[in-house]
Amino acid sequence: MKVLSSLKSAKTRHRDCKVVRRRGKVFVICKSNPRFKARQR
């Protein structure tokens, strides 16, 4: 999982990527290609 300062590029990397908020952090999850998982500080 990458830690990024901006998730704008991360959510457009793959069409299955979704932005979710968990425990006060912003995550990008991608079910079909988990390589693209990311979180924001």
Swiss-Prot record:
Keywords: Ribonucleoprotein, Ribosomal protein. SUPFAM superfamilies: Ribosomal protein L36 (SSF57840). One of its GO terms (cellular component) is ribosome. GO terms for molecular function: structural constituent of ribosome. InterPro entries: Ribosomal_bL36, Ribosomal_bL36_sp, Ribosomal_L36_bact. Transmembrane segments: none annotated. GO terms for biological process: translation. Belongs to the bacterial ribosomal protein bL36 family. HAMAP family: Ribosomal_bL36 (MF_00251). This is Large ribosomal subunit protein bL36. It comes from Xanthomonas campestris pv. campestris (strain ATCC 33913 / DSM 3586 / NCPPB 528 / LMG 568 / P 25).
